[in-house]
Every structure is written in C-alpha cells, then in structure tokens.
Amino acid sequence: MNSVNLDKYSDPFFLGETKEELRRIRQDFHVHPEIGLVTPRTSRIIADLLKDYGVDEVHEGVGGDGVVGVIYGKLPGEASVGLRADIDALPLKELSNHDHVSQVEGAMHA
C-alpha cells in the first residue's frame, strides 16, 4: 500500500500550481461536454489524473464510465471520506460567450 503523500498539499506553491491546473481541466471539460451517463473522454482524463497524482487505487468503468479513486490512510482503521461528483453535461444550448464555451452543439455544463 503506497499511500499518497499529503504533506505537499499544504505547500502554498503547490496549491497555486494546482489551482491553475484544475482551472485548465475544468475549462477543458466545459469545452468538450458529454451528455448523460456516456462520458468516456471525461472519465479517461479523470482516471489518468488520479494515477498521475499517485492515488493508491484507480478503478475505471464503475457503473459504466464511473471512476473511483482510493487513498489509504496512514493507520489501519482510520476514518474514510467519500467524495462524489457528477461529470456529465446537460442537453442545453450554451448562450455564454466566455473563453471556454462548449464546442458541442446542444450540450453544456450548467
């Protein structure tokens, strides 16, 4: 069990870099939305990022295109936290004009 080293996450320099990376990822997802529960591109990106970040286990294809990342605690029996996020877009026409507007006609993150 190679648990993720969480110490770096409190480093202000790391947090600044990560904030910009997460902004780029979020904007990419908005440019390339996937409707419904069919999200192969988005799921692949998330799984690859979790692996790159050193998450202990990454399970793909959960319930279709779902992704589960597991991070082990340092001590046996330690409390666990579960996080969940929707990654699919809605079948709506985007009327915004920002830099990361959807390029998929009739689909957007709202």
Task: Name each region found by the language model.
Residues 2-110:
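Acidic/His- and Gly-rich active-site-bordering loop/insert found
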